[in-house]
Amino acid sequence: MTQSNPNEQNVELNRTSLYWGLLLIFVLAILFSNYFFN
């Protein structure tokens, strides 16, 4: 039970959430571009 483990997990969670956020924005941008162009 060291304090480095939860800190590392929090960093990984922040990175994964950031990647998922960017992916979601990317997909939404594609959907909106397809909607406007069509």
UniProtKB/Swiss-Prot annotation:
The keyword Nucleus does not apply. The chain crosses the membrane at residues 17-37. InterPro entries: PSII_PsbL, PSII_PsbL_sf. The keyword Nucleotidyltransferase does not apply. It is found in: Plastid, Chloroplast thylakoid membrane. It is a single-pass membrane protein. One of its GO terms (cellular component) is photosystem II reaction center. Keywords: Chloroplast, Membrane, Photosynthesis, Photosystem II, Plastid, Reaction center, Thylakoid, Transmembrane, Transmembrane helix. It holds the Pfam family PsbL. GO terms for biological process: photosynthesis. Its main location: plastid. Belongs to the PsbL family. PSII is composed of 1 copy each of membrane proteins PsbA, PsbB, PsbC, PsbD, PsbE, PsbF, PsbH, PsbI, PsbJ, PsbK, PsbL, PsbM, PsbT, PsbX, PsbY, PsbZ, Psb30/Ycf12, at least 3 peripheral proteins of the oxygen-evolving complex and a large number of cofactors. It forms dimeric complexes. One of the components of the core complex of photosystem II (PSII). PSII is a light-driven water:plastoquinone oxidoreductase that uses light energy to abstract electrons from H(2)O, generating O(2) and a proton gradient subsequently used for ATP formation. It consists of a core antenna complex that captures photons, and an electron transfer chain that converts photonic excitation into a charge separation. This subunit is found at the monomer-monomer interface and is required for correct PSII assembly and/or dimerization. This is Photosystem II reaction center protein L. It comes from Aethionema cordifolium (Lebanon stonecress). The gene is psbL.
